[in-house]
Design a protein with these regions (language model features):
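Active-site neighborhood of glycoside hydrolase catalytic domains
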Residues: 94-116, 123-213
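Short, well-ordered beta-to-alpha junction loops that form the rim of enzyme active sites
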Residues: 16, 68-70, 119-122, 165
Length: 213
């Protein structure tokens, strides 16, 4: 983060637990709490924010943050658990979007600059840790719900990124979701570097959607 080193100016942070955590946790796992009144940011406050503050101190400037979920709360999912895939139950799409907005506001309330979100980390992966599957159709259906929630919460400057998975299928996912209605809602396509080269997919995205990051 130091300008004398690599000079990183962005970080990606998980919402709720992920595979880097010692145990699974949720800020609000209470199905009865539709208003998120018992939303508890303390795990992030205690375990993540100190590292973020240290990174910002090393950088000498605010870092731009991307927030990504590994899984919605277990009760919102078809399999009733955070791990082993499952999908977001459609009836909880609106509440899940508000949950993500709440995370953004908690970071902002502490002076951190959230720049963007992805809709789901690795939406094709079924893992033994926190994971949630979105088909093309499911991610496309959730996109306008999330976009509307951001606007409703005064967060319409937050960028939405699709995919957030390996780059060999990035163009396939982008082209399945983006049309004249959804394209203005999306700022970019997030890619992981895990498998092979497949750089042509990034070239195809750049050619077909030159405005995307």
């Amino acid at each position: 983060f130091s300008p004398a080193k690599m000079g990183y100016d962005r970080v990606r942070i998980h919402m709720d637990s992920c595979d880097f955590c010692a145990e699974m946790y949720e800020a609000d796992g209470d199905e009865a709490d539709a208003a998120l009144e018992r939303f508890d940011f303390s795990r992030t406050e205690e375990l993540i924010l100190p590292m973020l503050r240290d990174a910002q101190a090393a950088a000498g400037r605010p870092l731009k943050i991307m927030l990504s979920p590994w899984s919605p709360p277990a009760y919102m999912k078809t399999n009733g658990e955070r791990c082993h895939g499952g999908s977001l139950r459609p009836e909880y799409a609106g509440r899940w979007a508000e949950y993500i907005c709440r995370y953004i506001r908690e970071f902002q309330a502490r002076g951190f600059a959230v720049e963007r979100i992805s809709l789901q980390n690795e939406p094709k992966a079924v893992q033994t840790w926190d994971s949630c599957v979105y088909t093309d159709e499911q991610e496309k259906a959730f996109l306008p719900v999330m976009h509307a929630a951001l606007a409703r919460n005064g967060l319409d400057d937050i960028e939405i990124f699709l995919w957030d998975h390996n780059k060999e299928r990035a163009f396939e996912r982008a082209s399945a979701i983006l049309d004249e209605t959804t394209r203005p809602m999306v700022a970019g396509v997030a890619c992981h570097w895990y498998s092979g080269a497949h750089f042509e997919n990034l070239d195809m995205i750049r050619s077909a959607y030159p405005e995307l990051k």
